[in-house]
Amino acid sequence: DFKVAAFHGHAWPNPAVMTADAIIMAHNHPTVMLDTPLGVKITRPAWVRGKPDIERLAAAFLNQDNVRLKEEEEPLSIFEEEYGFECGSPEIIVMPTFNDILGGLPVNSEAPESLLGPLFRKKLVDMDTFDAYMLDGTFMGSIGFLRDRLEGRV
């Protein structure tokens, strides 16, 4: 069975989301900023998806609940002991806004820690390794590639 967990993204989710195969979150309204041949920058809503560092995420959940890890302790083992279930390896999917009136955060031009919510503010997700897709499903590339392209490095 494929398990999906969803949460808004503005606050810490329940640790049980880590048992899902996919975690769907919102709150950031991700967009991708593109540079046109005329030098005009435009932004478009985008889906963002990727795999987090599970050990760092497990350690962060424990830290959030005031469980301090000793240097030799494995975060995944302690996570299972503390919460009573095994931490999976979920993919994170960040939903765009579907309302043209609402703005968004250009994930390829914002500093990753300026994104909203604890998973991003605490740098638990390496956004540059995540992929961006337009609303119609068109694959745009990794956020890191899109950042390099916007900054003229590609």
Model feature map: region roles:
Residues 1-154:
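Extended recognition/assembly regions associated with phosphoester-bond processing machinery
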